[in-house]
Amino acid sequence: MANNNGEISGAKDRRLRLEKVVAALEKVGRETKEMIFRMAQNMRDSEIIYLFNQTTFDLFNILQLVTKRINTEDIYGISGYKSLFENAIKINAHAPIDQFTLFILEYAADIYSQNEDLFLNMAIPDVNVTVGNYFGIIRVDFFRKLWEKMTNDEREMFKDKIILLTTFAHTYLYQSILRNR
């Protein structure tokens, strides 16, 4: 019985998150939504997943460079997260995009507009990707501390990757909707 309650609770959580995403995507500009819709129509699922995962690797590489520069590799453990991510996508390539789509799209309008203050202050929980085990991908407090130590160029590279991840997640959502029509 507990399993059924867990499933019901999980379904409720997903529905509530989806409602928040729908409301958030209404704030995204029409041109952006149209561009992403065209991407969803013209890209294969495997392309979107590949690009999302590659962009995530690029993001990890940026974070590794920053932590090396400021000599905090041991504190942040980015290489460990990168290794876990790499193993996760070997087991299930679409797990990361499946997990993050509804979380990141709740903030899509702010991310697309590059609203740095709202982006840094959004209430993102530490998210787990399930691939037989759990590990945190987003560690918000660590990220905020690291952000303060980034150069402007590093911040710009990071923001570019977050915008790309959001775009691929948005495309993936639209494509899922098109596929289920």
Give each language-model segment a name.
Residues 160-171:
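Short, hydrophobic/amphipathic alpha-helical patches that form generic packing surfaces
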Residues 2-156, 170-181:
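Terminal low-complexity "docking" segments
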